């Protein structure tokens, strides 16, 4: 499962430019957690130190104000922004089936950055890329 998880992480844009050593460190730090259908993973407005979730198995719905915004499945992720800024959650995330996630807290990522400082620049570069895409989409 570890090799499979490295492949999954490598497929996440946030981690796409990480080397094997950095990905291995993330996998050693991250926790695997399983959620029952309907059990809230995160709640809109909630303040938490757990930031990033990578879905290993299962499916979730992302909802705001009771309205479904998106559905995510294996290999997809959520919570990457609060991993860095710790802001309250912008939506509810609820599993529609038994769902297993790889979970990375804000504290975990800060500890990893101390050991692997290049991680910070790689994360910043990806966030800048996403911000640029959003800016371009808004100006079109």
Language-model features: where?
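Generic structural signal for short, solvent-exposed loop/turn connectors between secondary structure elements
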Residues: 61-73, 138
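Cyclic-nucleotide recognition modules
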Residues: 68-124
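Flexible, active-site-adjacent loop/turn segments at secondary-structure boundaries
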Residues: 6, 12-16, 39-40, 67, ...
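Alpha-helix boundary/capping detector
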Residues: 35, 41, 52-56, 84, ...
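A small-molecule sensor/coupling module
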Residues: 5, 22-25, 89-90, 107-140
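Regulatory nucleotide-sensing modules
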Residues: 5-6, 10-65
């Amino acid at each position: 499962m570890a090799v499979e998880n490295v492949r999954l992480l490598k497929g996440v844009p946030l981690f796409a430019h990480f080397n094997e050593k950095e990905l291995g460190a993330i996998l050693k730090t991250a926790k695997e957690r399983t959620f029952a259908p309907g059990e809230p993973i995160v709640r809109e407005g909630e303040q938490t130190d757990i930031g990033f979730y990578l879905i290993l198995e299962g499916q979730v719905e992302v909802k705001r104000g009771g309205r479904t915004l998106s559905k995510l499945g294996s290999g997809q992720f959520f919570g990457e922004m609060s991993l860095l800024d710790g802001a309250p959650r912008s939506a509810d995330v609820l599993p529609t089936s038994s769902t297993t996630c790889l979970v990375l807290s804000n504290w975990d990522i800060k500890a990893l950055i101390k050991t692997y400082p290049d991680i910070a620049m790689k994360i910043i570069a990806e966030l800048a890329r996403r911000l640029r895409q959003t800016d371009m989409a808004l100006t079109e």
